[in-house]
Amino acid sequence: MAGVSLVLKGRVALISGGSRGIGAATVRLFAEAGARVAFSYRQERERALALEAECGGPERCVALEQELSTPADGHALVAAAVRAFGRLDVLVANHGIWLPEDAPIAQMAETQWRRTLAVNLDSVFGLVQAAVAQMDRQPRTPAEAAGHIVLISSTAGQRGEANHADYAVTKGAINSLTKSLSSELAPRGIRVNCVAPGWVATEMSAAAVQDPELGPKIAAGIPLGRVASAREIAGPVLFLCTPLAGFISGEVLNVNGGAVLVG
């Protein structure tokens, strides 16, 4: 990205779900900004290792295979990142699942409900818990931030999403978690914010965005007239972790082309 300087030089960032989509774009952008980056993946080892190599190899960027569906999984991922780079300054909790098939609440399987909450919420709790403990014990000067946490939500967390109540519930909870954590952690020098994308051109949303009937309807509902690129979500995430955002905490930043405004 033109204009990205080494604003995160000397910092270590952990990005969950970093092998594709918004996560991969964020890994690339943070590496360009000078950070050492650890990121998690669950499948597609070759893709993850290719991204690791693209962003500088194990000395600068490391891919960590990790299931994320329990608090213990979150703890394990933070521990692996700290083993790789010795510290942790930034956590971006990006991973999550969204099933493209409609699931009306009367027909939704309990297994789907519990799986979505486990991945999208339970593991985030573990990630945040372990990251905060690590940030708290790291030495810093009074002028330095102890750490930055960015959670990834969705417009569904504010507007709801028919036939995808499981997903919307988790994202609404992430919004609330952001504000609660900000109030709790700001006095300790840890800023917590959230980025809430709308429709983004990623593999997760491809079935809907590329559908010949649904795709144009999605674009028509966005004032800017198109879906976002993954890079356009990664940019605000990076911004929130830099000194330019040094007085921002507890915010849910909508990055959706104005879509919430016409909800």
Predicted regions and their residues:
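Short C-terminal tail/terminal secondary-structure segment
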Residues: A2-V4, D102, R159, V237-L238, ...
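Conserved glycine-rich cofactor-binding loop
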Residues: V12, S19-R20
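C-terminal helical subdomain
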Residues: T70, C194, P216-I248, G257
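Substrate-binding pocket helix/loop in short-chain dehydrogenase/reductase
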Residues: D102-I105, A109-L117, I218
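Active-site helix of classical SDR
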Residues: V128, T170, T178
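Alpha-helical segment proximal to the catalytic Tyr-Lys
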Residues: A133, S183-P187, G246
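Residue(s) in the substrate-gating loop at a strand-loop-helix junction
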Residues: S154
